[in-house]
């Protein structure tokens, strides 16, 4: 259907020897003019052995569309940790704050309050076990 938006965001937090694979797929059909489609894959690597593979894909069969994609993969920003520690936060607390901020970009878009609270609970539980 034309004149619609599609926003696909995938976020991964990887530790140990974990590996994520993102293979995005957006198809814009012939009669879907006016579509705005976007794919984003962001990964936060908590260890030197974690891996993230990204392969965004678009199949566009009409004109008059806007499609974009992006990917980012990296570790926690050491400058951000230093800044928080200079404000009296421990290194572990700083890492948790930054991970929460990374996840919040997705959780904040959830409109269902029950689901949002559950997701926040899951994140906090995982952070407690880091």
Where are these regions (language model features)?
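Active-site gating/interface segments in enzymes
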Residues: 1-130
């Amino acid at each position: 259907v034309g004149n619609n938006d599609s926003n696909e965001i995938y976020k991964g937090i990887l530790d140990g020897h974990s590996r994520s694979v993102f293979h995005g797929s957006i198809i814009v059909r012939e009669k879907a003019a006016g579509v705005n489609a976007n794919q984003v894959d962001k990964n936060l690597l908590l260890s030197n052995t974690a891996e993230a593979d990204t392969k965004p894909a678009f199949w566009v069969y009409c004109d008059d569309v806007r499609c974009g994609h992006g990917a980012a993969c990296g570790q926690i920003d050491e400058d951000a940790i230093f800044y928080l520690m200079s404000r009296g936060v421990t290194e572990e607390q700083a890492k948790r704050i930054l991970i929460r901020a990374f996840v919040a970009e997705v959780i904040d878009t959830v409109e269902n309050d029950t689901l949002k609270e559950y997701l926040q609970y899951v994140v906090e539980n995982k952070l407690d076990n880091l």
